[in-house]
């Protein structure tokens, strides 16, 4: 039982620290909070955290046989290339369109929260790199003796991953929601930030794919 407590806090901390720096999911959560209010930002974070939990479970499953099937990593990286390239262009075009709109949009607090929830799930699902992260984390915990591929171990790992992600996303939502004087500027440039992040992830993925291939 003691190893489950260690497993929970270790996984929670690692998942939380994984998204401390700005990335696709947390920047989108902050953008949602700035444009639609704190409640919608939290709903987005909840949807994204559910997908991250599923990715953590997938990471556990894949880590069991990944060393015998290196083509899995290659396939995930190729899928990531297409996704990042598409969204880098998409957010850049969206930022250009928003730049020419001079009307100030009123914040819609009572927007469709169900749509925001599924948007959080979609954005998190498009980011496939956490699967590799959870694979590596799972392998490290296995070597340390904190996880044993049993039902309770896997359940604790998955739940802790989701909660750690939600905790950091909530901080992003709360932080940007408090900066009321800066939310307009953030909303104005958030699409450029997302486009730049997608471009950066595209370059990183290309490097990793080249490294694996050669």
Role assignments for model-derived ranges:
Residues 1-20, 42-46, 107-126, 152-163:
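Small-residue-enriched transmembrane helix starts and helix-helix packing motifs
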Residues 3-74, 137-152:
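Juxtamembrane transmembrane-helix termini in multi-pass membrane transport proteins
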Residues 12, 16, 20, 53-54, ...:
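Hydrophobic/aromatic residues within the transmembrane alpha-helices of Major Facilitator Superfamily
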Residues 38-114, 175:
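Membrane helix-loop-helix hairpins that form the core translocation module of multi-pass transporters
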Residues 47-51, 119-133, 194-198:
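Select subsegments of transmembrane alpha-helices in polytopic membrane proteins
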Residues 66, 113-117, 121, 141, ...:
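Hydrophobic alpha-helical segments of integral membrane proteins
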Residues 69-101, 156-175, 180-214:
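Selective transmembrane alpha-helices of multi-pass membrane proteins
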Residues 128-145, 204-214:
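Alpha-helical transmembrane segments and their membrane-interface junctions
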């Amino acid at each position: 039982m003691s190893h489950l407590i260690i497993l929970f806090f270790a996984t929670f901390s690692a998942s939380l620290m994984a998204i401390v720096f700005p990335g696709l999911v947390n920047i989108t959560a902050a953008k949602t909070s700035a444009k639609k209010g704190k409640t919608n930002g939290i709903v987005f974070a909840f949807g994204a955290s559910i997908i991250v939990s599923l990715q953590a479970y997938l990471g556990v499953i894949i880590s069991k046989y990944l060393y015998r099937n290196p083509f899995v990593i290659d396939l995930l990286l190729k899928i990531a290339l297409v996704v990042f390239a598409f969204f880098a262009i998409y957010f850049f075009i969206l930022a250009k369109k928003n730049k020419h709109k001079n009307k100030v949009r009123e914040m819609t607090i009572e927007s469709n929260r169900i749509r925001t929830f599924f948007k959080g799930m979609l954005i998190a699902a498009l980011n496939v790199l956490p699967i590799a992260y959870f694979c590596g984390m799972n392998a490290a915990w296995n070597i340390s003796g904190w996880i044993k591929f049993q039902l309770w171990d896997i359940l604790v790992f998955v739940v802790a991953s989701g909660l750690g992600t939600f905790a950091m996303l909530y901080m992003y939502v709360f932080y940007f929601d408090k900066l009321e004087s800066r939310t307009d500027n953030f909303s104005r440039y958030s699409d450029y930030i997302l486009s730049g992040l997608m471009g950066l992830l595209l370059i990183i993925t290309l490097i990793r794919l080249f490294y694996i291939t050669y």
